[in-house]
Structure formats: C-alpha cells, structure tokens
Amino acid sequence: MDQEVMDFFDFSKEFKREAAPQGYISSDPSIMATETNESKVPKREVIGTDYVPEIVAKEKCLLDRTLRDDCPQSKRNRTLDDLDTDDEGEETEIRRDDEYYKRYRFNLNRDKNLPIYAKREEILAAINAHPVVILKGQTGCGKTTQVPQYILDEGYKSGKYCNIVVTQPRRIAAISIANRVCQEREWQQDTVCSYQVGLHRPTSLEDTRLLYCTTGVLLNNLINKKTLTHYTHIVLDEVHERDQDMDFLLIVVRRLLATNSRHVKIILMSATIDARELADYFTTTNSVPPVITASHGRKHAIEKFYRDQMGSIRWKEEEDDQLVPQINDHGYRAAVKIIMVIDNMEREAAIQSRLSYDEALRYGAVLIFLPGIDEIDTMAENITSMLQSDRNIKVFIVRCFSLMTPENQRDVFHPPPPGFRKIILTTNIAESSITVPDVSYVIDFCLTKVLVTDTATSFSSLRLTWASKANCRQRAGRVGRLRSGRVYRMVNKSFYQREMAEFGIPEMLRMPLQNSVLRAKELEMGSPIEILALALSPPNLSDIQNTILLLKEVGALFLTVDGVYNAMDGDITYWGTIMSRLPLDTRLSRLIILGYVFNLLEEAIIIAAGLSMRGLYVNEGRRTQGADSFWMHYIFADGSGSDLVAIWRVYLTYLNMVEIAHEQESAIRWAKRFHVSLRSLKEMHLLVQELRWRCTNLGLIPFAVNPSQMMGDREKSIILKVIIAGAFYPNYFTRSKESCAEPDRNIYQTISGHDPCRTVYFTNFKPAYMGELYTRRIKELFQEARIPPENIDVTFQQGSQKVFVTFKQDDWLADSSKFVSVSGRVQSEVYKAVRMRLDRIQRPIRIMTQNNFMNYVQQRGIGDVIEGRWIPPTKPLNVELLALPSVFSKTITGLITCIISCGKFFFQPQSFAECIRNMSEIFNAPQQLRNYVINAGAITKGMMVLAKRDSNFQRATVIRPENQSNRQPMFYVRFIDYGDCALLSMQQLRLMPKELIQQYGDLPPRVFECRLAHVQPSSVVSGNNRWPTAANDLLKSVAKCGRIDIEVYSLFNNVAAVLIPMKDGIINDMLVELKLSRRSDEDYMSRKDHDFRLRRQESARYLTLTERQQINEEYLRSCQLPQDLDLPPPPLDKCNTIVMLKGPSSPLECSMQSIIRVGSSKRVNIDNASVNAVLLDADPQDHHDHLIVAHATVESTNGQTLTARGTTLMPNVQGFGALMVMLFCPTMQLKCNNEGTSYVSILAGLGCDPVTGEPYYAEHDVLINLDVNILEDDVVLINQIRYYIDSVFFNFKEEKDPAVSINERVSIYTQLRSLINRLLCKDRSYMQRNMSNSDFEWESNPELPMPNEPFGKRAIFPMHSLTELQEEDMGRLMHLRENCSMLHKWRNFEGTLPHMTCKLCNQLLESVPQLRLHLLTVLHRDREKQIDYCNQ
C-alpha cells in the first residue's frame, strides 16, 4: 500500500482543525440510557399536500402552452421553471410500413362475440381524435387482447407504421396474453407480437409491433430514453391497481407527452377505474380524454344480501363493534350459520325442482373472503366444530392464499368428493387472480389487510381495514358463472354505501417511496418533490422528505446538492443509480453492492432474490408449523443462525437437484421432504437470472480469484455476515438478558444447578404426583420433536413443581439432532423443546390418583412407603471411588488419554497408574479372553465388554451398533478408563466374564472429563462453538509429551475446567495469542466452585487427613445431580387423572431490543418462521452484547411491538455491534467518559445541523454503550475499510461510471479481507458500562480534529474523527486501587456485607458471595490490569 494512504490513516499526523459533527453508539438494552423527555424521539411533523397545487398549476400551464404551440422548439429544459419541447427523433411525416405488412399474415377477422367488439369503431375513432383515451371494460370483455389488435389492424389497412406497447401489472399476465394473441393470429412468437418481462425478452424487437410487458419494464425504458417516440401507441392496462410503478409511469407519460412526444397515443384501460379522476389528470385546456365503457352482460343473476337483511342470523355484537374492522367469534359463527342456511335452502329447492341436491352440491361451492391466513385457520376451526352437531352437512374445506402449494391450489379447482360441499376460504387473491367456475355463493367479510409504511421510522405494519367497494364488486363477480348466485356481505347496507371507500388507498400513499424518489432523480426533470407532486395521488411532503433522509442513510443520495446541504433533496450517488435499476428494495440493492465490493456478488444476488420472494417454505406465515417443517430451516441455516444463509443454501440445493440431476420427480420428492415450495424456488431462480443480467449491464461482475487466495468457508461466512450487517444497517437488535443484579445466578437457580445448555423444565407438576414413576411418559412428549427417549434424563427436585429434562451430550449417539446445527454451547434439543412450547403451551400427561398410586407401588415393590410417603428407589453411589479431582487438589499430574477438542478431553491422574496396570493384566489374561462374540444379537446397548484398544483389551461400554446392513456387524464402544470411542468388529470384542463384571462393573471410570478454562473457540476462526483444528493439534502435541500437570480451576457437572502450564506459558493464553481462541468468562457455577475450592485449599493446612477426606466426599456428593430412575410407568387404564404440564421452558430464553432511537422503547419479537424464533443466550458465560440484524422490521397496529424478519445472528465477537455501526453508519460521534480517558459510547446516524445541533434523522440515530474498549487504532482500521469501499464506486460528478480497473479491484479486495480480519480478531479488554441521559445529543466540538477527506463531499462513507484521550488522573487511579484493595479484604468476610460498589466496574455488590464471584469475572480482572492493580 502506498505510504500516502497509510499516512492518511495515521492519527499521529497533524490534522486541520475544523468544526465537525461527531457520533456515538449503543448496543446493550440493559445499559441504554433510560427514556427521558430529552431522549424521546420528537414527533416529526406531518406535512400534507399543500405543496402540490402550485406545482400542478405550473405543470398545467406548461401542458396548455405546449399543446397550443404548433412549432416544436429545439431544446428541452429539464426543470419545471422553463420546459420546452424537443422533437428530435419525433416523426413529423407519416411513416409507412408497407414492406413489413407484406412479410406477415394479417387476418382481420376478430371475435365478434366479445363485448368489446361492439365498441371497436368508437374506440378507434377516439384514439385518432384524442391523445389520451380512457377505456372502462369489465373483466372478460376482451379489451386486453383485442384493443391492441384493432389498432394494429388499422395500421395494416392504412399501411402506417405502428409500434404498440401494452403494460401488465404481473409477469405471468404479460407472457400468457402475448402467447394467446400469437396463437389467435397464428404468428410465430417474438415476431409481430412478443413480450418482455425481466429476462424474458426477444433477442431483437426489430419486427415486433405489439409488445406486452410489465409496468416496470416500460417505466425503466422511458426513464432511460426520456421520450415516448419509440412507440406510436402506449396502452396502460389495469390502471386501477395503482401500484407505485403505475402511478410513476402516469407521471412520466404525462410529462413526456407534454414535452417531446405529442404525437404518441395513450390508452388507459381498467375494469374498475375512477374514470373521472383519470380524465381530470390528463385534461388540458384544449383536450378532455373521452371515456368509453364496454359492458359485459351476465348470463346469470346475482343477489346481494347485507347483514341487516339476514334476519334469521342473530347478531350479538354491539352497534359500535360493527364499525371496527375485525372478525369476532360472533362473526365466524354467523358465517357458519349462513352455510347451514344455504344447505337447507338447496335441500328444499331439490324437493320442488328437477335440480338434485347432489348436483346442487357440485355447483354450489361457497367462497368466503377473509383478510389473512390466521383468519382462514380460525374460520376452518369454527366450521369444523359447529358442523359436528349437524352430521347431514358434509363440507370439503379448501384454503386459498398466495403462499399455498401447487397441490393445494389444484384442490381449489377440483370438484369436491360426492356428497360434500366445497368451502373455499380465501384471501383477496381470489378477487382477480383465480376464477373458480363452480362457486355459487360468496360470503364477504369486506375486510382486507394492507401493508402501510411509516416513512419517518421506516417500520411497516400490516393493518386490518375495510375493503373498498371496488374490491367487494370484484369479489361479487366470482359467482354467477354457471348458475345464479348469492353474495352475503357481513356489513350493514348503510355502512357499505356510506362508510366504505369507493377505491383502495394507492401504494404511493402507504408504501415506501425510495424507488419512486430514485426514479425522479434518474428522470432529471426536476427535484423529487416537483416530480411526485404530479402524481395522480401525491404523497405528503413529509413522506418525501423522510424518504430522502432514508436514501441518504443507505448511500443512494449524498447529503448535499451541488455541495450544499438540502433536507428535501440530494445528488444521486452511483449506489443510487444501481438501486434505481435493480427491481429490489434499496437495502437489498445495497446488499448486492456490498457483495460486489467483497467479491461475494453471487451469494448476495441469491439472498436478495430469496428475500424478495414469499413462501419459500411450506406453511410459512401460518400460526403454527409442524416440527419437521420448522426444523428444515435450521438444517439449511447449518448453524449460521441466519435466515439469509438458509435461503442461499436452499437455492444451491435446488440448483443441484434440478439443473444437475435433471429429474423433476426427485426435485418434487426433495421439496416435500424439506418442506420447501418448488413454485417459489422457480420464481426465485428467474429473479436470480434477471439480477445477474442487470448487474452485468451495470458493470457489476465478479472477478476470478487465485485458488491460493480463495476464502475458506469460515472466512466467507464471516465476510457474508459483515455484508449483511452493512446492507441492513440500522436494523440492529441486541439480545437482552434478565435485568437483575446476578442474572447468571438466577439461571442456575431456576433449574436447580443443572446445565442450562442441556436442560429445559416443565412446571405445574406437584410433588404429590410422584413424578419419578412417569419419567418415560414425559420423555414421550418429545417424540414430536424427534428426540429419542434414550437421549433424555428426567429428574425432579424435592418439594418443587418443576420437572427437569436434560438432554445427553454424546456425539456418538445416533440422533436426528445431528442434522440440526446451532451456534454456541446450547444443544439443539433445547431449541427443539422450547419450540414445542411456542407451538403449544401445555402438554397433557395421564397419572394415577394418590390412593391408587400407593397401592400400585406397594404391590410391585417399587421403592419404599414410609409413613404414607413414597420413597423412590435410588442407585448406589460411592463417591470415594470417583476419579474426580479432590476439592483440596489444585494441581494434578497424569496423562491426557483422549482429546476430542480443547473443550472436551479426558485426563487420567497418575495416582491411578497402578490400578490401570493391574486391570489391564487381569483383562488380558488368556482365560478372560475366551468369550468370543459369536452372535451379534448378544451385544446390547449399554453392555460392558472387553474391547481391543491398541494391542490390549480394556473394559468398554457399547454405545450402539453401526447402521450398516451390507457388511459384518460393527459396534461403537467407549473405553471406560480412557474416554475415547471406537468402531470395532465382533472379532475385536469379548464378552466380560461374570466375575469381572462383579468386580469391576460398578467401578467408576479412572479418568475425568476436562475442558480448558477461561477460553472459548474464536468465532472468527471456527463456527458453531467448534474448536479449530490448529488448537486441537496444539493440545495433542502437549498430550504426546506424556505425563503433564494440570491446574484445576473448577468442577461442575463432573467436568473439570483446567489450565495447562507449559514452558512458554499457559496453553490457554497461548491459544488466545495465536488467535485460535478468545478469552471468556467462566459461568456462574464454575466461578462459584472455584471460589469454594480456593477457600478450602486455603484452610487445608488446618485440617487433618480424615477431615479433608470427609469434606471432599461431601463435596463430591454435592456435585452429583439427581439421577433418572427410568421406571416403567403404570398402565394407561389405571391413569385416570390428566395433568397439564406447562412448558418446556429454558432459563436461557431472552428477548431483543432495537438499538435505533425510535425502536428502543418498543417490545421486539422475531418472526415465527425464523431460525432465531427460539432465541436463547447461546453463550451464557458471555456478558457482552450479541448483535442480531434483521432484513425488515414490521410494527404492530398499536405501535408497541416490532417484529424482526429475515434475521441473522452475528458472530460472537466482542464489540461486534459497535464495530459494525462504526463501519457502516453515515457518520458518528465517539463519546468519552467525564474524565476523557476512555470511549464509552457511540452515537451514529446522519448527523446534525452544525448550527442548531438538531439531528437530521433523529428516529434512526443509533446508540451503543460500549462494553469493550474501542481504541484509536480501531478507528484507523475502520476508516481504512470505509475508504476502500468508497473507492470501488467513486466517480466525479461529470463522470458516468466509476473508473476502477480489475487489478485495482483485486488489490482493494485483498486489503479489505486483511483489514476485516485484523479488526475482528483483535482481543479487546472488557470495560464498565456508562450511561447518560444526554446520550442521544449530538455534541459540538470546534476543537475536534477533522481528518482530510479523500473523496470530499462525494464520500458515501466519510472518515470518522475522534477526540484524543487523556491520561488517567493519578489521584483517580489511587482511589480505584484503594477500592480494589478494600474489596479483596472483604472477600474472606463471613458475616453480612454492607452494600458497596466496585468502582472499577460500576457494579453494586450486596453480599459476600456476590463480591467473591465478581472479583473472578473477566471484566474485573481486565479493569484491574488497566489500573495496574496487583493484589498482595
């Protein structure tokens, strides 16, 4: 790297001092500043549409002036102040096309039976006479296919050139209609008639005269060319849908029609259109668009009934409830009653007429319109439950919604089974997209769900609202196809007529405006406000302003216009240009941009396409999902904790199944097995291809990397998560733990000392129920989660209503959980168990009454009954025989016999060497090895055998047989006295003689399990809490040295946390220095045991040998948890009482909190379909922040709850949240403590007004109170990364495209990889948290040095400045050291501790045990090092 670049990032060099805004961040919910009047987000003023009339009036004058002017002007000005016409490229003479018409066959016979044909001449005359024509024709009248043909036929007759484009709102419609026209006219596809949708486009449009395309395709084409003159006729179909593309297309068409395309004809068509509004929109002084209506006479009558006309239905709601958009229980029951009335009516009609009841059933399907999937499920439950009382009515219920599978979709059209009536429960998808001929009845609740976005917060919410009359009319049109029909509207007629709106709310008034604003910038015909004011329904001025702020936040717009800050506008960046040309949300486009920067473009494209799709998974969006369906998400996520990674892996698997295998049947089987939707994946595949094509056209092309420089899987995973964090900033959340003085102590108290990473619990099981007899029944509850009973231990605590369920931790057990990988220490079974509770909160279990129970256990001799109280049987335990380290032993000498990883290895104390030799001699005596295994059936699970280890036989336990049927039987065994496992054949096993079993069967293992203390695997180097190979190899090299010493830190769950001294230091510390691990806190029980051991070892010299032995036995006995007795339960016919267990629950369950200002006080949920829906503290020993990034955030209707969707759990790296905010925020202030000696928080966002200090975008300001030390060199690294990201796309204003060569990109890519690795691998010391009520205030500091800006005001990521830290005051240092010394003195105090505070860590200490354990935390030990304190 050039020295100039390095000097630029050197903060020791002199800076030019200028006034500059600063920044600050916070990611821990428990320490965020409390919400005060100062920190609350000021309510942004809603500014309406008062700005519109002036701009519209100016536009009207322009239109009138232009249309009056016969002489075209030569220049076109691109502002509203002075717009002229430009007829370059516009034909003033009539263009002939006779040769073209001779090449193709033109059959002029049109279908005269279509209702539109009657209006043919009127339509053509109007088109010839007017620039704009409005055609209103009901669905099925033929307008979409016939009107363009009428125009083309006229061109053929006259020989005039014709080029017609017809827009459709959906791709499938454009394709199918174009194909239908080609078939009707017998034209070859992609000749006279063609279509263009995304990637589906003809290789050449030279011969195309009739083009069907999506609205977006035409819009982008017109924005790029800025003229309509490439077409003679533009037909805008389905104008009533009023999506943003259509509304913006109307703006562009009207503007270009007035400026440079006056001879182009515009035809607007729709079935349900507000013709007057459209006519007014295109009216000028000299021209009023004519409105032509084409009716569609129905063959069968439709009767409409309203709620107040249904006298036989007894409505129970209050009058006021009828005005609220909702469906209550009475509404559901009323719908079922209507179904009953319909059935009775048809039975009576069958008696009086020739139409049989069975025939009426076949054509008498009922279509019920409901607002969402949840309401569909509730309606189905009500129909099923209410009709159980009437066995004469048989119904076949079909659900119909946008995410349904193709199989379910076919059920909608198939006839019901004989004797059944088909009931279709549908959302508004059946309004127009699906037509079912056999529907004779519609029950319409007149409701719909509308997605509304608050532009100030960018939160979206799905709101239940009344449908428009236009919607209801379309719904009513679903009946009367084969016979007369009835429509039942579940509202009063007066309410329908007076209160319900005629049309729905246009997208431009309720959806994000980012793409429209960017298109306005690309159009270059005025500011976004001037352009959007011309919309058919102009948005509020405040919505445009908020959108511009959001676009500045994502890097689409600069803060300034021509170098001057403008709150209502901003120059478009090259990022903004890319975003405007990709058919995606701006944040998904940002994902692709960052993917290009880090050369992970393909991954970014796949994820962006997947996030744009709905329904990749079957049952997505349902209230409950099957266990198998939900856990497929985890399989695809592969321990990443990311819905986005899961999407990427689903797609890659799909490609492998479809493109490589080329077997449709295998793909279908795969989709069913993994509960994914092939239809959605096919649509996603098309979008992926389109995005690749668009990126190539934009110059976004990945480059080949030398194989030696390719990313490894782990590095790729980390970089991908960094990209995700950058793309979706500031949709950041943190996992929040229980807010109490000792949250980790509460975890273990909740589960009575069990391992929280393997244990869940039920409640509501009273001690009187004698739970030990029902352990197998409790294990059976987990069958729905596919957890085998043999992997479960069930225990109880005396006097408690809790049932503890612990999952065995054994990598060798055959279990489907192996396929489910999760990050952190928590076992996947815990996630499965908690998920069970989320689906159903109570679990029934059948038990006996107490009297019957006592008789039962006494008759069978199960345990003892003493004084009317049952004592369960117990397993004998001789703790003095255990090989566990004594409480008085600090250092133990011995051998490491087996290494699975640095987190699990086995140690054999030297004191057992002679015992091991003796046993080996006995086991390998010839007379003991005669019992060969002849029959594989003689080997059973859990059986003790003699197994060959190296050259000798040792005692071993059979784990399980190998699941191989086509070769000789083999068995997995564990060597009891060494800890290792092996797969052995029958020839390598011997049955153990009875005398050996009697002698050694109950002897505990002569090894104990260990793990390295104070360290855990580095998330940057290895994932899923797995230790990297290099770390394990280092430990193995130590083990090969033979006898070593280990230092026992603690003992918990019979696992010793140890330190291993070496010549060059402790191996635990060496792994941290080699960046193979990172420092971590020991969890609560480990620190508690360590404190107990320390105090016992300090008192050992005062105790006799006998006393020490007695204390050690008591200690080891206290370390043993209750054991699962696994007693057979009583027969079910004797269990007449049902107990509802509540759970399972985990003490590690945690919630989330948003770190942006507007969301910090709201409750946060995770989408039920996310892999993070079960959110646990996967590393409970860590007390630093864990960051979660969401693709989108949805707000509840009441505004109190946020739901995070498309979530990704970020790597467990200290300070990761703070680093990502600093890396990807527009600007920030790094705030110091009062003494100015350390950085304590970060405030990030768009910054503030340098004069008033008011934040530009207060709602999205981000605050993180730091829990690790951020130093000056961290900011240097971050500035370098920001510089390199900017350099990829930098261009001067007059330049069209960036001018970065491939070689420069490769160099930037290499530098970015190195810098990211250095940033994330750094071992950062912990620090105490600081809070302030002024955390959200942007501070003004004229003395702050402002770094030179290499890209000036055209930087998307400007350089961060920071305040220089001060040296710690000596007086304060002495004060802190005195406080430390005092705490250590109180450590051995046995009485009641007066409340005191650790001033190093800002921690209140209320008891001596709490003080002792606090002194052992990494935070406190780091702080002691920082002040150079040494405890004497």
UniProtKB/Swiss-Prot annotation:
One GO location term (cellular component): nucleus
Which parts of the sequence form the motif DEAH box?
A: 237-240
According to UniProt, the reaction catalysed is:
ATP + H2O = ADP + phosphate + H(+)
One GO term in the molecular function aspect is: ATP binding
UniProt keyword ATP-binding present: yes
The record's Gene3D superfamilies line, in alphabetical order, gives:
1.20.120.1080, 2.30.30.140, 2.40.50.90, P-loop containing nucleotide triphosphate hydrolases
Q: Which residues bind ATP?
A: 137-144
Superkingdom of the source species: Eukaryota
The record places domain Tudor at: 936-999
Could you tell me what this protein does? Answer: Probable ATP-binding RNA helicase which plays a central role during spermatogenesis and oogenesis by repressing transposable elements and preventing their mobilization, which is essential for the germline integrity. Acts via the piRNA metabolic process, which mediates the repression of transposable elements during meiosis by forming complexes composed of piRNAs and Piwi and govern the methylation and subsequent repression of transposons. Involved in the repression of LTR retrotransposon copia.
Q: What is this protein called?
A: Probable ATP-dependent RNA helicase spindle-E
The gene for this chain is spn-E
